[in-house]
From Swiss-Prot:
Keywords for this protein: Protein biosynthesis, Translation regulation
Keyword Protein biosynthesis in record: yes
Domain of life according to the entry: Archaea
Protein name: Protein translation factor SUI1 homolog
């Protein structure tokens, strides 16, 4: 059985580094907005959706922050103010600290 080949770099999936490179190159913005009834919502945007599965990432962040959330228009929305925690977790997941902007 042949190993799966990455369509971007042509290497086998276990040797592929496309996702790590993509994580380091992205400019991610994390900020909080007020929604209905004065509720806070953490918005995370700036991901390259061709490489990163936003639904899977949102699921992990919701589990870590113990909150609800969704994916809309290439952004992740989490209920509550989780800016610091999300930034720390993204760094642990391999995103560059320099590419994350917290407002």
């Amino acid at each position: 059985m042949m190993p799966e080949i990455c369509p971007r770099c042509g290497l086998p999936k276990e040797l592929c580094v496309c996702e790590e490179i993509a994580k380091e190159e992205q400019k991610i913005k994390i900020y909080v907005t007020k929604r209905r009834f004065g509720k806070l919502m953490t918005i995370i945007e700036g991901f390259d959706t061709s490489v990163i599965d936003l639904k899977e990432l949102a699921k992990k962040l919701k589990d870590i922050c113990a909150c609800g959330g969704t994916v809309k228009d290439n952004t992740i929305e989490l209920q509550g103010d989780h800016r610091k925690k999300v930034a720390e977790e993204l760094v642990k997941m391999g995103f560059s600290r320099d590419s994350i902007e917290i407002r």
